[in-house]
Amino acid sequence: MRHLLFLCPCVIGVAFHLWLFNFSGLFSWFLVWSPHSYDIVVGVLSARHNHELRNVIRHTWLQHLNHHSSLSQRVLVKFIIGSHGCDIPVEDREDPYSCKLLNITNPTLKQEIESFSIPDSAAVITEHHVVNVNFRVLYPVVITRLGVFQHDSAAGFQRNITVKLFQTEHEEALFSARFSPASSGVQVNGIWYKPVEQFILPEGFEGTVVWESHDPEGLLSGNVHHVIVNDGGGIFRLTTVKEGLLPYEFTEGVEGIAGGFTYTIHEGETLLNTLETRPERIQNHLAALEKEDALLQEESTTFQDIVFVNVVDTYRNVPSKLLNFYRWTVQLTRFEFLLKTDDDCFIDIDNVLKMVAQKELQKENAWWGNFRLNWAVDRTGKWQELEYLSPAYPAFACGSGYIISNDIVQWLAVNSQRLKTYQGEDVSMGIWMSAIGPSRYQDSRWLCEKKCEAGMLSSPQYTPQELMEIWQQKERCGNPCACEDR
């Protein structure tokens, strides 16, 4: 036992010596692999198929950086690309901005379709005098009649009710029908209908049907989740509060259904042909995706300037692409500022670096860009925003180019799993930044629209050929917009 006690200090000493040796080796390894520190990391949002735009950047301002060692040591440029392409062809999606299948099956053709019916157990007289429901058209239809639920079949129609159909964000009804005891319309399957002027509601149309009682008594209506919806095989769908969507600003009353409308499917034969050719189209699309994946991997290996982020690469996922890139920068790089731009934008990187020095931007809580103020929220189209309640967005910088300090990137990266994404990355940034109140540096030289101005820092929406032309002009005469005749 005495010998064992004598040996213990020796064993501890050897172990401590080995620990010091291993720690010093680990520390040396950390120093070797410690990331290079940059003044600016540039993140270029790029769609998977935009090979030509990326190559133009590589042969213009990015090549200029790489040919000047002093600049290449200060600036790191990465293209941000989603790891996954959408596996649904554009023709078979609900809209071109997302990756959701247009799920139409067995459409009802060449006849009028009644949109809603209600079981007797689900229909109740409510205290509400105004009831509305929102819907989205997924394939073109023609509305033929508007209707209200039957109140008392024995006594005939004894109510005064107006039904109106609105296009979203429009205060004037597209068409309406007034029901009264003297003019009740035609009764079909428990609903009183009146014809309306017929015209085509296109794919993507966002509409609201509003029923209004002009009597002291409320409307006979049903909860949207208890009413039977006849969507013609997937031709339209309701957009309800349950899906997390907010009511449109002008909509009055409560959500519910107090009647219906009839409709026909427009150009049904074309729809049938589209559905019949879908399997072959999807097969060809998946084969094209495999080729695209291979080309992107080859491109990444060749140029070493792509960051693949784990999202499906669609317009609606651009905010998620950006948050994923912020996480990447924080984990694998060291920098003072981050510049975000798009692959169709001209960037005068020399001017940017010069202005960073001249402005003496604070290295904490700084956001330098060209800010849009009181920008109205769209409820339809490419920039449709259904989940932001306010009528206008907080101040946000135009997406063609802006710079944020490292600590803001750190905050975004740390909170990226909790931050809600909205319809665009620029407005999402404005909403996210409203929580921390950064110091905003307004500068109109980060152009918001496609135009060329001497001294500009960025300008958006160029074709590859146009980007090459303005860069060549800048190289020849120092002005990207024009070279003066000498």
Swiss-Prot record:
InterPro entries: Glyco_trans_31 (IPR002659). Glycans are attached at residues 103, 160. Residues 1-10 are cytoplasmic. It holds the Pfam family Galactosyl_T. One of its GO terms (cellular component) is endoplasmic reticulum. It is found in: Golgi apparatus membrane; Endoplasmic reticulum. Pathway: Protein modification; protein glycosylation. One of its GO terms (biological process) is protein glycosylation. The chain crosses the membrane at residues 11-31. Residues 32-486 are lumenal. Keywords: Endoplasmic reticulum, Glycoprotein, Glycosyltransferase, Golgi apparatus, Membrane, Signal-anchor, Transferase, Transmembrane, Transmembrane helix. It is a single-pass type II membrane protein. It is an enzyme of class 2 (transferase). It catalyses: 3-O-(N-acetyl-beta-D-glucosaminyl-(1->4)-alpha-D-mannosyl)-L-threonyl-[protein] + UDP-N-acetyl-alpha-D-galactosamine = 3-O-[beta-D-GalNAc-(1->3)-beta-D-GlcNAc-(1->4)-alpha-D-Man]-L-Thr-[protein] + UDP + H(+). GO terms for molecular function: acetylgalactosaminyltransferase activity; UDP-glycosyltransferase activity. Its EC number is 2.4.1.313. PANTHER family: BETA-1,3-N-ACETYLGLUCOSAMINYLTRANSFERASE, UDP-GALNAC:BETA-1,3-N-ACETYLGALACTOSAMINYLTRANSFERASE 2. Beta-1,3-N-acetylgalactosaminyltransferase that synthesizes a unique carbohydrate structure, GalNAc-beta-1-3GlcNAc, on N- and O-glycans. Has no galactose nor galactosaminyl transferase activity toward any acceptor substrate. Involved in alpha-dystroglycan (dag1) glycosylation. Belongs to the glycosyltransferase 31 family. This is UDP-GalNAc:beta-1,3-N-acetylgalactosaminyltransferase 2. It comes from Xenopus laevis. The gene is b3galnt2.
